[in-house]
Amino acid sequence: MRMMRFVFIALAEFLACSGWLYAASEPVNPHATPEARALLAYLNSISGKATIAGQHNYPNVGARWTDMAYDLTGKYPGLFGGDFGFSGGEDKDSVLGRPAMIEEVKRQYRNGAVITLTWHEVRPIDDEPVTFKGSVQNHLTDAEWKELLTPGSPLNQRWQAQVDVIAGYLQQLRDAHVPVLFRPYHEMNGSWFWWGGRPGKDGSAALYRQLYDRFVNVHHLDNLLWAWNVNAPNGSNAGVIEAYYPGAEYADVVSMDIYGEFNQEYYTNILALAGDKPIALGEVGKLPSPEVFQTQPRWTYFMDWSEIIQRGNPLELVNAVYHAPQVLTRDDPRLAGPLAAIRKATAERLGAAPEAAPAANPAPAQ
């Protein structure tokens, strides 16, 4: 508890000196690490005031698309999105890229980025590696789903072994004191992933709760903040979001993926469900324009999907967003200062030497 207060005080002092209101908040995991608690408090402090720019990267490409954002704008995203993948060989989604991805996440955190991680989990009836449509976008029968949620059943045990592999990677980040916005079973109100499209208490939300229990109570992954995620009902076969909510006690952040227009109704609906929790755009294709943030100010971060930053957005829009006054990139003192305060407090708590400040937006290696 003393350690937690140490990091909290460091962040609170920085925010107070910067003129930002310090928002105390409690993670859903009562044993959350000091760094996870401080990150959640920071997200609450910027809610309604600023939005962190974020960029997704496939597991086997390093920081390619984060570097592309810098090439396009001269600014690094403030949030780095990694992925655990599902395929094999040299594919961009290859599971062989996981060890390097974890090391890249550590580097990005040291350099001042917030971290979020996604996992396109394979069906528990399959073995990695798989193809996207053959497993991730395939389905389970109702009988298989029931068995998956039955403790001790053969399929439940296969699922445990499957998720325990990912827990091992997340433990490396826990031991490195890296807080992670973890977004499991994303877009669960849609029917395009095997885990999605099952509303109600024994549906997709039950699987999310089962994973929470495994990661928190068995593996003690206390560095995770839990970012529950749904897809916007933008003409797709996505169900009513409330029917997929696991409960306020399982979500630190309430997030929505939007590919298309940023309809004000989506924002209103997610706010109504989130209450005082921070909200986020878990994935986007087309970037939200600066005007969107004027009418939808409570988005605390967005994450653009990999190559879409270059191939799906006009250069003028990308630069307008990254240079908007309410958008936080890695070099912005409103983001860089608080995250540096968290890392400094961690180092002092552990008795480590102070870290060297990273160079300001170094050009990525070619």
Protein language model regions, located:
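Aromatic-lined carbohydrate-recognition surfaces of secreted/lumenal glycan-active proteins
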Residues: G54-H56, R183-Y185, Y208, Y212-G239, ...
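Alpha-helical scaffolding within the catalytic cores
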Residues: R37-L39, V61-D71, P99-E103, V165-Y169, ...
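Substrate-binding cleft of secreted/luminal carbohydrate-active enzymes
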Residues: T51-H56, K277-N361
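Bacterial N-terminal signal peptides
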Residues: V7-S18
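N-terminal module-boundary/linker segments of secreted carbohydrate-active enzymes
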Residues: A24-G85, E90, S94-V95, K344-A353
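Substrate-binding cleft of extracellular glycoside hydrolase catalytic domains
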Residues: E90-L221
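Loop/turn elements at helix/coil->beta-strand transitions in domains of secreted/extracellular proteins
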Residues: G48-T51, K75-G78, R110-I115, D175-L181, ...
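Aromatic- and acid-rich polysaccharide-binding/catalytic face
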Residues: G82, I241-F262, M303-W305
